[in-house]
From Swiss-Prot:
Domain of life of the native organism: Eukaryota
Protein name: Putative uncharacterized protein YGR011W
Note: Partially overlaps NMA2.
Native species: Saccharomyces cerevisiae (strain ATCC 204508 / S288c)
């Protein structure tokens, strides 16, 4: 996993911030597969997108998920997204809220 490194154009994040962001991303992403959503990447991440703070975030991540479609592993996908977010944004506060939603057949 990423360490507390500096990426171009953002401030350094400490280990606690990185861990919090990573854990919440994994929490949001993995239930989608368990609940039997479509295998299409865009569909899988619709609920994930709803947790993002800005349209800009959605646009950047959506584009890079499409680029990263060949990734076979959900772990690889989520690590890729986490890395991308850390590289693109300065998190002075935690920008994500985990939205628990009821979906037919499961609870996210």
């Amino acid at each position: 996993m990423l360490g507390p490194s500096c990426f171009p154009m953002i401030s350094c994040m400490n280990t606690e911030e990185i861990s919090l962001l990573s854990n919440n991303l994994f929490t949001m992403i993995f239930p989608l597969r368990k609940c039997g959503f479509s295998s299409d990447v865009e569909c899988q991440f619709n609920i994930f997108f709803q947790t993002l703070s800005s349209v800009t975030s959605k646009s950047i991540i959506y584009t890079l998920i499409k680029v990263n479609r060949s990734s076979r592993s959900w772990i690889a996908k989520s690590e890729f997204i986490t890395t991308l977010i850390l590289q693109q944004f300065k998190f002075t506060t935690f920008l994500f809220k985990v939205h628990r939603k009821k979906v037919p057949g499961c609870t996210i």
